[in-house]
């Protein structure tokens, strides 16, 4: 589980945002970005500082309800408890589109979970499907290895790495955007399905977007719509996708500017700025012959999904998502943490866990104390409708 990402991966969030209850990053590079090994060390140290009774090498194979609460089966034995917090996250399995089944068997395919570095790929061109954080990072890395890369782009979230001389995630944090609560969001279901922003964590704080990749020589095509008779068919809506992503980015930058007008008095913060619109290719290919030898491998960077195959409690909807209201699951004594927009927009990030956990503790404590309250209501006066 610790090695299910590519070798060069770094967090999208700067080190100063890596904080958990009673523990935070205190190294010499607060504006840097943690590697996978850094994250492992950070979490391991937190567990030691917190004195948490962590059981390593103890995978849970099932959770089921009993009259007294819950029974967990693990490879190290059985655990019985009154309450369970599900913190397994939302990125357990690769989300591979159904069109993958029509790809010619002669073309090796892998997902972002299986990819480690360019050396594992066969020589020749690479098609990467998906242009969120994972897709753009892999496209950049593989292109730098000397291969021709074709990047298939669908809906995406464009962000600059820095804005007005500050990391863009500083703005998300300071302006309160990340603290927006789930019951204040108009379309919560859509917010929970948004792809990760096009960001990369590098010492140079590089902005990695479609324009940067195009300028480097990566070929940009539309969303992969189908594979028929050995040909990949791409949608022709690139300009619309780019215009929508640019519009949403500029609206967010407007939000930052409005907040800064009344809250920021630091001379080190630069003036408002706007970025060049995403450049659409003069003519992008609508189809690609996968049998021509031009594409020698495909990487599915099309997102992830949760895995609840081990959860023997009827709280998962037909799409595989947990039914919960702000982390209070549709079963007494069952809770969740670490899911997209669980209680705030920052819920999936390391520093988002503390506030969410604090909100749920009171509900959990009252449940264990035998208090009478409706499952699903964390705070009075707040929304209690369940959202999956």
Task: Report each predicted region and the residues it spans.
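Conserved N-terminal glycine-rich FAD pyrophosphate-binding loop of Rossmann-like flavoproteins
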Residues: 1-24, 28, 158-179
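Flavin (primarily FAD) cofactor-binding/catalytic cores of flavoenzymes
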Residues: 32-388
